[in-house]
A protein has these predicted regions:
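Short amphipathic alpha-helical interaction patches enriched in hydrophobic/aromatic residues
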Residues: 89, 93, 149-153, 265
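Short, well-ordered alpha-helical scaffold segments within catalytic/effector domains
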Residues: 103, 107, 158-165, 254
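An amphipathic, basic-hydrophobic helix/alpha-beta surface used to engage anionic
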Residues: 1-131, 135, 177-180, 187-188, ...
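Short, electropositive alpha-helical surface patch
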Residues: 132-147, 259, 287
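Short, glycine/charged-enriched secondary-structure capping and boundary segments
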Residues: 71-72, 95-97, 137-138, 193-195, ...
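Von Willebrand factor type A / integrin I
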Residues: 1-33, 42, 51, 170-174, ...
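Von Willebrand factor
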Residues: 141-176, 188-190, 210
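Short, flexible loop segments at the rims of nucleotide/cofactor-binding pockets, characterized by
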Residues: 58, 154-158, 181-182
């Protein structure tokens, strides 16, 4: 992709996702993802309605008037985006490819985070750690992340979620709010790794999928290629039995994936590329508020 084309795409994504963050997501994000708790700020004179449990008895005794402690939320969070860059994300039969939607969702979360004074870090992963972008604040940092998502070329096309979860635990010693963005087209079970990570971090899983992964169209002979392994074959989609078998495989796989998230106490949402991700994210944020 040419540099000028990348700049145009970055700007287009910024306009859309920054607007969403400012107008729709900022308040919901703040409510859904809490800070580290309440920290002491100052003392002031007692006012009618103040909680008597907040009275600072030492200061009250010194000045012979009641004073209360004032607390403020320790807001600043570290937000980590674990972004799947494997070969299966370069697929789309509807409005856009899965990678395009993942980029927009990640950018929306990132802008929401910096508007709440949170830091953002990113890990690109396949079946290995492809790139690590340490946490920072600011618009320039977000634009750099978007540019990397648009232009990054991974070394591997395969997926192993375990690798990125183990990496997260090794580089982030303090608690983070972590989003995993992937189609979760995985061949290896990652339940144990997710359970370990979720004990330390506030984990949220966002699955992006294409409608054709859920249901095959009846269009006769079709050439299909596994984007991660390169395996290629022709299938007869006019076979009702084949289509039903394919649909059952999808449903069974989704059931197993949801069980993995539930056993790990990980909030999650699944979004198709032909759906409005704004509605799905808002629903997720509201459920957490």
């Amino acid at each position: 992709m040419e540099t000028s084309e990348i700049i145009k795409k970055v700007r287009k994504i910024e306009i859309k996702t920054r607007g969403l963050s400012s107008n729709i997501f900022a308040g919901q994000y703040h409510s859904a993802f809490k800070g580290r708790g309440m920290a002491f700020s100052e003392v002031r004179e007692y006012q009618f309605g103040d909680d008597v449990r907040d009275i600072d008895w030492n200061v009250t005794a010194r000045f012979h008037r009641p004073y209360v402690k004032v607390f403020e939320e320790e807001r600043e969070l570290t937000v980590m985006l674990l972004i799947d860059v494997s070969g299966s994300l370069d697929f789309g039969t509807q409005k856009q490819m899965k990678r395009d939607m993942v980029t927009e969702i990640a950018a929306t979360i990132a802008f929401s985070a910096i508007q709440n004074n949170d830091k953002i870090g990113v890990v690109f992963f396949s079946d290995k750690i492809e790139k690590y972008i340490p946490r920072k604040k600011g618009r320039k940092h977000i634009l750099y992340i978007i540019r990397e998502m648009l232009d990054f070329q991974p070394e591997s096309k395969k997926t192993d979620v375990r690798q990125v979860l183990e990496f997260l635990s090794s580089v982030q010693k303090r608690r983070t709010t972590t989003f995993i963005l992937s189609d979760f087209y995985v061949r290896k079970d990652f339940l144990q790794s997710l359970q370990i990570a979720s004990r330390k971090h506030d984990m949220v899983a966002i699955q992006v999928y294409d409608q054709r992964a859920r249901e095959l169209p009846d269009v006769g002979l079709m050439r299909v290629v596994d984007a991660e392994t390169g395996f290629e074959q022709y299938i007869d989609t006019s076979s009702k039995r084949l289509r039903e078998s394919y649909r059952k495989y999808w449903m069974d796989r989704q059931t197993q994936l949801m069980e993995t998230f539930n056993k790990s106490n990980v909030d999650n949402v699944s979004i198709a590329t032909n759906e409005d991700f704004v509605k799905s994210l808002l629903m997720l944020f509201k459920q957490r508020s």
